[in-house]
């Protein structure tokens, strides 16, 4: 059974007499443990897809299943539990608490995730064992992004959702961050979903979903995806 299924999902935003169809009857499925890239230009519907899968928004029409459960039918309280237990988020900007140390930032998830990994373990995975007691202001942009990845993964989510995770980074640091995400997909069996407009990142994916004007244009499985080092920026 796929870990994710979208079935005829539409999302329509209404403002006065105006309707905007951000997604139009979208259907696809994803298997567990895949590295997935949702690719498309600005305004294509990529972020709407991510928000729906993350339980941050609900569809106007259609069904969304995660591990066989219809999350489109969940109440607000149930969606909060879903966000806490099932999905992790990594954004383009790091959203770290400046007054907390690196370790303390990662430990924040212990308050909401019952099966959280130890902060030290996740920070070791992202190569930051030597920075446990540093504050975010003492880190580079790439290091801060790796802290945000460690924090998201410390929740032990089934699915990690990433919105342009390397968008604010230089190419060398971006490759480093993508290597970490690939490693987590392979070593922990996590399903990684990245939203991006960068076509080069799509070359690394097991599955590429191309979105345009709120519709799925194609879903492509890549038998031999490139490594992060092979991708030209």
PLM segments and residue spans:
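Conserved beta-strand-loop-alpha-helix hinge in the C-terminal portion
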Residues: 215-233
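ABC family nucleotide-binding domain
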Residues: 2-211
